[in-house]
Regions:
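Short alpha-helical scaffolding segments that buttress acidic/His motifs in well-ordered protein cores
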Residues: 8, 12, 270-278, 321-329, ...
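Conserved phosphate/anionic-ligand binding catalytic regions in large, soluble enzymes, centered on
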Residues: 9-27, 283-302, 343-354
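Alpha-helical support elements that line or immediately flank enzyme active sites
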Residues: 18-35, 300-312, 357-365
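Short, mixed-charge aromatic SLiMs
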Residues: 44-59, 91-98, 321-334, 376-389, ...
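C-terminal regulatory domains involved in ligand/effector binding and gene-expression control
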Residues: 77-258
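Accessory "access/gating" subregions that flank catalytic or transport cores
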Residues: 205-344, 452-460
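Hydrophobic alpha-helical bundle architecture
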Residues: 313, 324, 330-403, 415-424
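Extended hydrophobic packing segments that form well-structured cores
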Residues: 424-460
Length: 460
């Protein structure tokens, strides 16, 4: 299995990579591949979607219903304009009609054609969904099961049954599947982790395309932070959460002299960057999965810290950061999970913290062993972290948790670079521990809003 840096860092929309980005991609894939390409689109009289497991329990708060409707109309998360979504949904719901792929209009009653099945779970993952199309006589034209396995990744029933994430067998110059293999590849080639990743990426793209693509990801992160610092108001949903980033940036800019008295003011900026991204995500804005939407603020916040506050920061440093972070993310993707519905928030915020810690260490010139150490520290102290969003919304505790994860990543980098890279717990061991902990964790702590803060804090 070969995973690209651009599989992990994908431009999409909020609030959730597993509950918004993934379902939109799945619905769009169903109508394009199984209706249009099979030549049956014009015969479709009814389309039905059914959501299972975590998608059923927290899907409304995560915008899964909206994502599926947009996907049925042929929209993709990296292309859709978030500002057009409210009008599109209003049209579908008012007319009780939907335009499959934007051109074949059929009747669609959301109450009967999009079911949140909270009693059933599909066999291979908590984030399961089933799409079925019928003709005018009620005969089934096509049906497919899909699983949104975290980070916007989607697999169908057959892929899930074979325990495959992506059917890509591209031969890479430096293949690795574990942290030890990654370090060995670096040792044998004399290359850094970022250089190994860059060489692997060349199996798919030219050098200029890789650089351009990574800088596009970085620009999207910067744009998201800028929007988050600018937009005001209350976030959607019943919690009535007020955006904090605009007031925070105003306070920091209006009182610059305060930073001279407080040596930790830089952390205020790191917090700000993370809050800005995750408030945008909660509002359904454009974000980068890093590696998920729920943890989308950590890597941009730490990368902004590097870009703004580290003397001598360079564009190459940004590229090294992203490539190194992606290599670490691949290890979690292949050997554990980046889905809160599968292993809790340790698989989202924990993984993002680990990726950011390793990426920052690389950008600051750390050795491959210090990078591995920083990544290990970043996860070790997030083990057991639950996913218990209040009201099923990606707001509390998710937004603040990203700020905490970003600060923790910077601290992990500092601890690792004060050492020589030698440590007792390897990254591979902590990844296995995270996977095992996630398997042992009760489902009520895995993005179902049936445990933890979700039941102890009343939604008002």
């Amino acid at each position: 299995m070969a995973v690209s840096v651009f599989d992990l860092f994908k431009i999409g929309i909020g609030p959730s990579s597993s509950h918004t980005v993934g379902p939109m991609r799945a619905a769009a894939r169903f109508v394009s591949r199984w209706l249009d390409e099979k030549g049956v689109l014009t015969r479709v009289a009814r389309v039905r979607g059914e959501l299972f497991g975590s998608l059923a329990h927290t899907g409304r708060g995560h915008g899964t219903d909206k994502a599926v409707l947009c996907g049925f109309e042929g929209e993709w998360p990296d292309k859709i304009d978030p500002d057009t979504i409210p009008g599109r949904l209003e049209r579908i719901r008012a007319s009780k009609n939907i335009r499959l792929l934007g051109r074949h209009e059929i009747a669609f009653d959301e109450k009967s054609d999009l079911i949140f099945n909270k009693r059933t779970k599909l066999p291979y993952h908590s984030n399961g969904m089933r799409f079925t199309a019928y003709d005018t006589a009620g005969n089934e034209l096509a049906t497919r099961d899909y699983y949104s396995v975290g980070g916007g990744f989607v697999v169908n029933h057959d892929e899930a049954a074979e325990d495959r994430i992506v059917a890509d067998t591209t031969a890479l110059p430096h293949p690795f599947h574990t942290g030890d293999q990654l370090l060995k590849a670096c040792d044998e080639s004399g290359k850094s982790i970022a250089q190994v990743m860059f060489e692997n990426e060349k199996a798919w793209r030219s050098e200029s395309e890789i650089r351009s693509g990574l800088l596009t990801i970085w620009k999207a992160m910067q744009d998201c932070v800028a929007r988050g610092m600018r937009e005001t108001g209350v976030l959607p949903g019943g919690l009535k959460v007020q955006r904090r980033a605009p007031a925070m940036v105003k306070d920091l800019c209006d009182r610059p002299e305060a930073s001279l008295k407080d040596p930790l003011t830089i952390l205020d900026w790191v917090n700000l960057y993370a809050l800005a991204v995750n408030e945008e995500n909660a509002a359904g804005g454009r974000v980068v999965t890093a590696p998920t939407n729920g943890a989308a603020g950590i890597i941009p916040a730490v990368l902004h810290y590097y870009h703004r506050f580290v003397p001598g920061a360079t564009e190459q440093g940004v590229l090294d950061f992203l490539l190194t972070a992606a290599a670490i993310g691949i290890l979690y993707k292949e050997n554990a999970s980046i889905s809160g519905a599968e292993v809790g928030c340790q698989g989202e915020v924990g993984v993002a913290c680990s990726m950011a810690a390793g990426g920052l260490t690389a950008a600051l010139g750390g050795s491959i062993y210090q990078v591995e150490n920083a990544a290990e520290i970043g996860m070790e102290h997030n083990l057991g972290l639950t996913c218990d969003p209040i009201g099923g919304l990606v707001q509390i505790p998710c937004i603040e948790r990203n700020a905490m994860g970003a600060v923790k990543a910077i601290n992990a980098q500092r601890m690792a670079m004060r050492g020589d890279g030698k440590h007792r717990v390897s990254l591979d061991k902590v990844i296995k521990t995270m996977r095992d902990t996630g398997r042992d964790m009760q489902d009520k702590y895995k993005e179902t809003s049936r445990g933890g803060l979700a039941v102890n804090v009343i939604e008002c």
